[in-house]
């Protein structure tokens, strides 16, 4: 992507090219007939993840190029994250709407999700390709061919801190997502239907919280806002653990507070990485925007994958999801993993990011130096 040049720009062609790949993967998975082979499903996952990587990476890197301004980048990624959560909510609401509103089956609801994706993707990408500009690139590029090229990125202190923070802040919500229904069923004794409603409240709050984190970043700086986000995640986890969930109003309020920080880390880390990319370009003369965002995407996925190890640990403790007589040790382990481990990871990420030195005044100096060199970015 960093090597792409042409009349359509650097990122637009990749976003457009992701559409047929995502459509193909969606049709393979959402329209799969009963009895399809594991190989077919595996291939469908490969296709859809390929398309998703193309689309999300081009989108994130493109957003970083829309403005060189420190604060404006926070706003851009704030609306980007708002759109992400809104889109996720819209898709997740399709199955219950089909089942409850149209008397459809669960299978029809799942397929409706696929058709929604197939129908909306070309429209959304066409609007973005038509209406969103892409500034010209002045810095030269040198393709990364060796492992050392990637390791050199992590030698930059700002980039290394961002990658570590992304790993930690991807790991923590991955754990809570994986164990959410188990925790509310086994520890809080909340029925699955009510737990799903609480999850909806959580994501609505996450969507509404995204602009708030952008606003806070403009007021106190991105790295301080990110540290505050991590500490709020920690506090919300302790609140979820401490407050009984038997009263719907109380449970809803607690889950709304817990959802508010959900959108903060993705948008703030990406806005900060755009600033770190400017610093790297000043140092090397090379624009590695797409490479930086691909590495950040990778650290987030590693964090999500690490979250799945909690299933192995729960199994070792003898926890059974469908059982109603899990041992005390298994339930303590579940609570420790749902609350304790993400809380520790959030605290550690706050410590990591408080050492970050690329603030607004420093970024202004970097942009001025790039301008003097004739590299507007």
Please identify what each model-predicted range represents.
Residues 1-377:
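Membrane-embedded alpha-helical bundles of multi-pass transporters/translocases
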